[in-house]
Amino acid sequence: MQNQRNIILAVVLSLALILGWDLVMTRFFPPQVEAPVQTATQTVQGPSGEQIPADAPDLVRDLDAALASAGRIPIDAPEIAGSINPVGARVDDIVLKTHRTSVARDSGPIRLFAPHGTQRQHFARFDWVGQGVKVPDAQTEWTVTSGDRLTQETPVSLSWDNGQGQIFGLTFAIDEHYMLTVTQTLTNRATGSIAVRPRGIINRTSVGADRSTFNVHSGPIAALDNTVNFDWDYSEVTENNGQVNLPGRPDWVGFTDIYWMSALIPQPGLATQASFAEAGRDRYAAVLLYDTVTVPEGQMVTYTSRLFAGAKESNVLRAYEAEGVARFGLAIDWGWFRFIAWPMWWLLTHLFNLVGNFGLAIICLTIIVRAIMFPIAQKQFASMAAMRAVQPKMKALQERYKDDKPQLQQQMAKLYKDEKINPLAGCLPIFLQIPIFFALYKVLLLAIEMRHEPFYLWIKDLSAPDPAKILNLFGLLPFDPPGFLGIGVLAVILGLTMWLQFKLNPAAIDPVQQQIFMIMPWVLMFVMAPFAAGLLLYWITSNILTLGQQKYLYSKHPQLKAQAEKDAADRERAATRDKKA
């Protein structure tokens, strides 16, 4: 029992440190964000030394003014809306129709792409690199040749004549979700052949981007040679002389936030290179560059790339993966426990489809998890009962061999063998629950399906902390308590259920451990307060089920129940003596 208590204590303290560290650092030591300032026009190096225009803005542009520029081609698809700027053929205006900025009914849709020069600029464009050939650039004014609105049924085509015998073309198509197909053509009508390289670029600012942490990646992302690369963040690109040439063959490359992503996907079967580059102050580029192609006189070449710009919905990403976008489903960083997290997400979403509420789905998921763990819990209680039964023998051995530790260990091992006791059996449920807890934590943190999903009463968003804070009288006072001081109703219920759970257990032999386990529920109440309401709901439900499970198992092992009642009586007598003293 003492070893088990020590392990529990170590696990709980480790959880508190791991889960609480990032919250404290985010709250009290936020990264400094600098507003964009005027910069000089510059270029940066791409793969093989190709120049990437930095597209440096003059001053920060007003978003509405930028979107009011003439000639924009509207985008109207089932999941996204926006427009394409014919200047530079930039896809620079995308909002996500089905995802809102907040739970408020009048909140607007999430803006993913914004025009060049605006505070949150984020856009994509497709061009060519060539020596001795006039190629389109960021300032090229393209002509619309077909289509006046990009929809799922109607693609849009643009062209540009460089005046030297080459005609460049772009055709945009869009599907029912978040994928644009971009076809680049080049017709050579001049005398002699030319050599060019097709290219796609995503340019975005890091201002306002989600913060990359030890357990959630935000920033540059790429799939290379059968793996998804989460190694780089924005600052590391800057520290690497502003340039990262990615090794291997890219399946896709782009930028990710917690819920959103933009990515370039090359035409299958063609050799490409990928890189990340600093493209100005607080601005970065993801570049996809095809190998050089020679276009003979009178010939045309065609390249078809894809641009993903949307929400990281697991079903959608996996559907694209099934269509040939390798490892696209792994763009959601489920972490070390992906083998548990994804099945848990799958089960949670299917339970939601059955019950119609993600809070109820979490409760159902918790019941299923506890039911699966119940046989192990039975073995744990049986082990605890056996350990209690041999405790007098253990104490006798400890007294007899107190000066001979090797002999004591041998005799204890013999006692365990003779009594058929495994002292580690009681720890197994704890170790099994750690990956389950972290997997659910990742699911609630990363699954966009949970975003803005309500429960009942005051819980309007299960992916956000409990809004009913005690220190501001549940919202009556006009301030938001900081971090771990923002104790909500769910955190208090969590502390109470955990306290009851510890109270039902037989007391630890060590008085210091007894004190630690008395205060541990309230420590965890503060630590868990800033976490998602859905995670607290899971833990509360698990605690309540554990209380019922303990009651049942105590009926099967009356010696443990008697010991727990004796310990409780001893604690009450000790508390009474302390008060009198």
Predicted feature locations:
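Helix-loop-helix
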Residues: M1-Q38, I84, Q184, V196-A223, ...
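Aromatic/His-enriched, Gly/Pro-containing loop or helix-boundary segments
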Residues: N3-R5, Q42, A65, T145-D148, ...
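Intrinsic disorder/low-complexity detector
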Residues: I8, V24, P57-V60, A190, ...
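Juxtamembrane extramembrane loops of integral membrane proteins
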Residues: L23-F113, D570-R571, A575-A581
